[in-house]
Amino acid sequence: MRDPVRTLIAGCVLLVGVTACTGGSTATEPVLNVYNWSDYVAPGVIDDFEREYGIKVNYDVFDSNEVLETKMLMGHSNFDVVVPSGPFLQRQITAGVYRKLDKSLLPNLKYADQEVARESAVYNPGNEYGVDYMWITSGPGYNVARIRERMPDAPVDSLRMIFDPQVVAKFADCGVAILDTPTEMLGAVLMYLGRNPNSESLADLKAAESALMAIRPYIRYVHSSRYIDDLANGEICLAMGWSGDVKQAHDRALEAGRGIELAYHIPREGAIRNFDLVAIPADAPHLKNAHLFINFLLRPDIAARNSNVLKYANGDDPSFEHLNSAVSGDPGIYPPLPVRAKLVPELAKTSQFTRLLNRMWTRFKTGE
């Protein structure tokens, strides 16, 4: 989710595995191995942690929960800190992937937004295994001028922008992208169809596949991070993306002086709301360092720095006073209560349904 990190990755970027850089680990060495989403930490945050604690951070990135889950279920990843989304954390807790947090080592939990913690506890009973990092929505992000040229009355605040074939077809020539996240996109298309976004009904799955196949000819690609730069560069004009990613793309376009205006709306039908949490794998080699890092992320000034750059709402209550007004006052990041009431948390799926969903998603991606 979510590339400042491309320009600041601390330590060595891992291509094969963390051990390729660490050469073996011990619990006492000043090392921390982090596996996080791309585009998901503000510039300087990792450097500041390294300077403050004298700990070398090896930082690797992924761009889908499915990639993270594969590594976690295999075990022996050598990662100390990972950032799964709520439903995946929930399922992986059941599989014994994570260890309970030692809250005595996390004094900054006192800053946690209790409302956010209550909402994310559906994935994380008692908030024992994960700490809220960011919460996000997904919806249409678009190039204002190009959309207006092709459809002056485009329903820019609606899921119709993506899932109505008669609408999305108008933008195929300027490029449309969609997130490569089968569970979240299933929820979004079911919401568009007026169905339960967390349904595991086979009838709903078939209806969702029909709706997705109807728009497939108009989708240029399916990817969870490429669209950020492509929106900023004008390579595409519409993406079903994460709120903060679209806003990061907007900032990049402004910084580059390209004259590209991008916008994001939480769909009026509602949106999938997801929580990303920081967790510690059961076999993490550097437990103390992992807790130090999580506690560092919970500092209000650090949480605000991340939100100010990433354009996502964080789970840290006092950080609000440190936020830029452009972030704290943006309804696409911190929506008003009536909009927030329409946000639906994505729930974990059974393994049997997940297999069916993944097969359907493969058919959608390949167009077959």
Walk through the language-model features, giving the residues of each:
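Short, low-complexity disordered leader/linker segments with a strong preference
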Residues: 1-31
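Early extracytoplasmic/lumenal segment of secretory-pathway proteins
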Residues: 24-95
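Extracytoplasmic ligand-binding site segments that recognize negatively charged/polar headgroups
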Residues: 83-218, 225-232
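A ligand-binding cleft/hinge motif common to bilobed small-molecule-binding domains
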Residues: 88-91, 238-259
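A bilobed periplasmic-binding-protein/Venus flytrap-type ligand-binding module shared by bacterial periplasmic
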Residues: 141-146, 191-194, 274-286, 305
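Periplasmic-binding protein-like
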Residues: 205-214, 220, 258-282
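Conserved C-terminal helix/tail region of periplasmic/extracytoplasmic solute-binding proteins
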Residues: 229, 337-368
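Mature extracytoplasmic/periplasmic domains
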Residues: 281-342
